[in-house]
Design a protein with these regions (language model features):
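M14 metallocarboxypeptidase catalytic domain recognition
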Residues: 1-253
Length: 253
């Protein structure tokens, strides 16, 4: 069977990542087993692979290392790094003495994408989010007043807006590059000065000052793990491991 050639000049969406893992498992059946540690909040499988030479003993009887990536939605480089690690070990087994020794005597458990829902939203829309797509702590923020992110000009990006405010503006244009804003110093009176806002719209606008609407995605999966969890920690969720993505990892380990 021909060995898969994966691309590392792009970020894989969920279906592409799934196919890459399936292809690797099919191409190296003696070294790679594909499984799922559970499902995400939206029902996607959270894939993991077990890497070891099965001919030299069961994976569960060897010293092991655990690797995961993409706990936060935007950490797509982490998932691609984990995928590259899998690919590298498999491709170099039997060619590189150290890789061969590792897979003969050790086990690798690799979860490339802990949070497939958040990564998919991050990769396919202009929106930014910290972690999970589950609405929290509010069920619905659409009627709340204030500024909320939106792709106003339809270019596929949500950037920043500079609004002139010579009295209270905290930023000014860089003297080196007019595209860059630099912080205003405390004694700086040589404007113009600006305020920076996320590109977006203001719901129920009644003039300044206006508020910023809470994000619909307030969870931080990294703060949902049992270690050092606290009920008032920002983004920590309802209780330790309340989120399926975190519970999947906790139960697996």
């Amino acid at each position: 069977m021909s060995k898969p050639k994966l691309r590392y000049d792009t970020y894989y969406q969920y279906d592409e990542l799934t196919k890459a893992l399936q292809d690797l498992a099919a191409a190296y059946p003696e070294l790679c087993q594909l499984g799922s540690i559970g499902q995400s909040w939206e029902g996607r499988e959270v894939w993991y692979v077990t890497l070891t030479n099965q001919a030299t003993g069961p994976h569960s009887e060897k010293p092991a290392i655990y690797i995961d990536g993409n706990t936060h939605a935007g950490e797509v480089t982490g998932s691609m790094t984990a995928l590259y690690t899998i690919d590298y070990l498999l491709r170099n087994y039997g060619h590189d003495p150290e890789v061969t020794w590792l897979l003969d005597t050790r086990t690798f458990y690799v979860v490339p994408r802990v949070n497939p829902d958040g990564a998919e939203l991050y990769l396919t829309t202009p929106y930014m989010l910290r972690s999970s797509v589950r609405p929290w702590p509010y069920d619905d923020v659409s009627d709340m007043p204030g500024l909320y992110p939106e792709d106003i000009d339809g270019d596929g990006y949500i950037l920043q807006m500079r609004v002139r405010d010579d009295l209270k503006g905290e930023w000014k244009v860089s003297s080196r590059d007019p595209r860059i804003m630099v912080p205003r110093l405390m004694d700086d009176r040589s404007g113009p000065f600006y305020r920076l806002y996320t590109e977006g719209l203001i719901h129920d606008y009644e003039g300044e000052p206006f508020t910023v609407r809470p994000t619909p995605w307030g969870l931080d999966l990294n703060r949902n793990f049992p270690s050092q969890w606290h009920p008032k920690i920002r983004g920590g969720g309802d209780y330790p491991a309340s989120e399926p993505e975190v519970k999947n990892v906790v139960d697996f380990i």
